Amino acid sequence: MLIVEVMGGLGNQLQQYALYRKLKSLGRDAKLDVSWYTQKGRQDSVLAPRRLELSYFEKLPMELCTEEEKQRLVGGEGLTGKLRRKLAPGTVRRFRETDLYHPEIFSFTDMY
């Protein structure tokens, strides 16, 4: 399963949603993670807190991931998740953007 984290303003949300739709069109099992907007404390360090503006588009199809699906790829927020990331980093399936374009994302099967 591929999980696309949605965060930022409307422009970023639209780009992340476009990636999600592309992955779905390629037949991948993809879901969106909107916890950046729903979990308390996730936007504390942001100067301009944002809202999930994709939800204003009523007929926009989007499948959201569950907390369990997210934890399976990146671990939990608590002590066990931190230990997993430190002691067994090979079990964590998280990709971080470093450039504008990453063609390898289309070859991933399990990634957050």
Please describe what each predicted stretch is.
Residues 1-112:
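N-terminal targeting/anchoring "stem" of glycan-biosynthesis enzymes
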